[in-house]
Amino acid sequence: MEIQKKIAVVDFGGQYAHLIASRIRRLGAYTEILSNEEPLSSYQKYSGIILSGGPESVYEPDSPTITTKLFELGIPVLGICYGHQLIMKLLGGVVERSGTGEYGPASLELHSQNGNSLLKNFVGGEQVWMNHADEVVKLPEGFSRIASSKDCGYAVVENSSKKIFGIQFHAEVSHSEKGSVLLENFIQICGASRTWGIDQFLKEKIKEIQETVKPEQKVFMLVSGGVDSTVSYLLLCKALGAERVLGFLIDTGFMRKGEVLPLQEKLKSQNIHLTVRDESNLFYESLIGKSDPEEKRKIVGNLFLEARDRAVKELDLEHGDWLLGQGTIYPDTIESGGTKHSHTIKTHHNRVEAIQKLIEEGKVIEPIRDLYKDEVRDLGLLLGLEREWVGRHPFPGPGLVVRMLAVEKTSTDEDQKEIDSYLSTQNGLSGRILPVASVGVKGDRRSYANCVVLNDVETDWKTLDRVATHLSNQFSFINRVVLLPFEKEVKNLTFRFTGMHLDKKCSDLLREADSVVESLIFKAGLYNQIWQMPVVLLPIGEKENEKSIVLRPVESQEAMTANFFPMKRELLKEIKTEVLKIPGIRYVFFDLTNKPPGTIEWE
């Protein structure tokens, strides 16, 4: 698609490079992703350039950089997070390690009332989303401060004469209020064309699939039951014809309760035939004694491939030229370290080594790999899926196995004393560090740290949000905070690590809890208000073999950022009461963690 006035996003390896491009496209301007090592002539083709965030520090040796001649082209430039810091450093400013870092929401304070073009229609007090450990402490000559936050002195800066801008927060994520307004303002500054839309993506993607898949080739599509793989399946069928796409669902033993048959019926109503194979015993056997989240994901990914190979042989498909179809979306590739400078947050099951090898050999097709969840849903509607279907909560490809935590992680007495010292100033709140670790993301890097549980003294959600954000920002050994609802005291409770077996017994336990929670959310009419609600099984109890449940309701749009859903306490009490009726469950926790620093899934 050739558009004259388009915007380039230079990828420095952050989780958000492609999300920036996606957001700009949603505003109607076409974007393309470029590396930071392009010749100057490549950048000259664009009407605007955005430098993305990234996991490195600009003052580190060998950190990614870009030619300073870029700033002499007369093209508007916007730096976001790492990109902002890089502009400041290259042009003579100073960047240093931040005292505390900022992860999550912050409030903007404006310092300019001169009608700054980038912050047009901002009034001050807007919430923005931070994710940084470094900060600018001195501006280059010619730049002025436009806005700050409580912990960031230079949240927005500009050189108005050269149209060079820097922002420390992530305007591209849905949790930055007026983030789209800021990006819209930048598009206007650039004078970019406004001709992009999801319908255009569909037309181009169909053409691309037809050109990529040879006439003699067919696609073996792994369908998980989620929205992503279903939309991918429909898109491939539309482009190639249903006779060239074989849908295959592997029952791993870690699917949701009563999911397989309704899924087959739903796809049949869309004229899609789905072959289902029960491989649960193999998955259970292969995961015996496994606990590390990365190892679990890789085992699941490899087992999917082995099951596919057996099916190909048994269905006598070996003699054809087959491609593997996957419902990969962009956050999957980003969290797996899918761009040049990005860090692996967690390896997705469709990014294990064996599948990477197939990708390199050109034997994998992923038709929606450049889209985000909200765009996938829009595409599903365009392809004829019901709104109820595309609005289903996301479910991880590996299934419940990534919601069953098994790694013990002890903390020190000094760590607990630090937590106690802070919470002693928080109006009756107290906390304990739980002996279990979960995956998170801080400053675009993977974190693997402990969780703090807080007592419940009927503190309002806003205050709990503030306290949870401070705990995860201030203490490097913490990346997640949970509440123990309706329990005024946690100091005298026993939180014992009880171990976890990735077997049918434990998966049945989680399946039942998940089903109870989902039914109550539907009953309350909140299913469509909550973007996703993972129910997590923890190896935490008072007695041997007891387990606990974590409720993780979040609000999001694209899965790159999220905040916890402030549930009404009456409903929370009902959910807790019903879940505790399940034999073997000791505690019910409520997750107060935003993303960042915690990923939506615990592993």
Regions found by a protein language model. Name each.
Residues 161-195, 578-580:
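N-terminal segments that mediate ammonia production and transfer
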Residues 9, 51, 79, 166, ...:
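Structural beta-sheet core signal
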Residues 41, 109-117, 269, 425:
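Short, basic, low-complexity termini and linkers enriched in Ser/Thr/Gly/Pro
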